[in-house]
């Protein structure tokens, strides 16, 4: 997610992967996983800020209020002694929305390439997309000026490839919608304090997925 880069840079994936491996976890940035007849295509995704067809305004709002743009830093210049990575002291320059837009384009290109690739189980195989940011307005909840920093409109991609399901988080709202043949669900775990609110008890089971055959 976006918070994993706080205190570091957007190019820290290799360091985050090392941390994950050190505790026996998988780091699945732009990675494909397989379980039975299901493949999982995983990436952070970020957004294109164009959900409401005004990317320039959305980028301005996001840049002025979101902590991402004050807690994630531009990579130190090549050859500098800054060291890089999630343990180095912040540079004088924070990232801007244009930087995360660039990452979104990269992640989306990777995702489209994977969706175009034949499923190893053929037509019987299922594809589940797992991203941090949301892919559709129908699962965005109440819309305001910040919503385009949480969700993109990937209707065209969903229609073309019809993945079986799309799981995402970021907005911490338990929303679900069928878009064409794709079951889109917010499976956020949420912040620790959210477990203290009775209306958020659903977060305990929000990460569970039951397949169509009940298994």
Where are these predicted regions, by residue range?
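A conserved beta-strand/loop element that lines the FAD pocket in flavoprotein oxidoreductases
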Residues: 25-28
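Active-site glycine-centered loops adjacent to acidic/histidine catalytic or metal-binding residues
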Residues: 1-2, 132, 169-170
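Metal-dependent catalytic neighborhoods of phosphoester/phosphodiester hydrolases
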Residues: 2-22, 51-53, 139-144, 175-180, ...
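N-terminal active-site segment of His-dependent metallophosphoesterases
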Residues: 5-11, 15, 97, 123-124, ...
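Binuclear metal-dependent phosphoesterase catalytic core
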Residues: 141, 145-164, 172-215
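Active-site-proximal loop/helix segment associated with metal-binding centers of metalloenzymes
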Residues: 41-127, 135-138
């Amino acid at each position: 997610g976006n918070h994993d880069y706080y205190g570091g840079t957007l190019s820290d994936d290799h360091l985050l992967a090392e941390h994950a491996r050190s505790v026996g976890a998988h780091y699945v940035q732009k990675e494909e996983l397989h379980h039975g007849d299901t493949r999982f295509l995983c990436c952070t995704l970020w957004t294109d800020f164009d959900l409401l067809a005004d990317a320039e305004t959305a980028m301005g709002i996001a840049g002025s209020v979101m902590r991402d743009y004050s807690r994630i830093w531009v990579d130190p210049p090549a050859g500098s002694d800054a060291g890089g990575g999630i343990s180095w002291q912040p540079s004088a320059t924070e990232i801007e929305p244009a930087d995360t837009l660039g990452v979104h384009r990269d992640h989306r290109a990777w995702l489209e390439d994977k969706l175009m690739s034949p499923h190893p189980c053929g037509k019987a195989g299922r594809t589940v997309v797992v991203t941090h940011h949301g892919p559709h307005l129908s699962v965005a909840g109440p819309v305001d000026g910040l919503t385009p920093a949480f969700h993109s409109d990937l209707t065209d991609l969903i229609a073309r490839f019809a993945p079986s399901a799309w799981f995402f988080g970021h907005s911490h709202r338990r929303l679900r919608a069928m878009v064409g043949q794709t079951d889109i669900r917010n499976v956020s775990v949420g912040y620790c304090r959210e477990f203290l609110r009775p209306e958020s008890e659903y977060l305990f089971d929000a990460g569970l997925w039951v397949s169509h055959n009940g298994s």
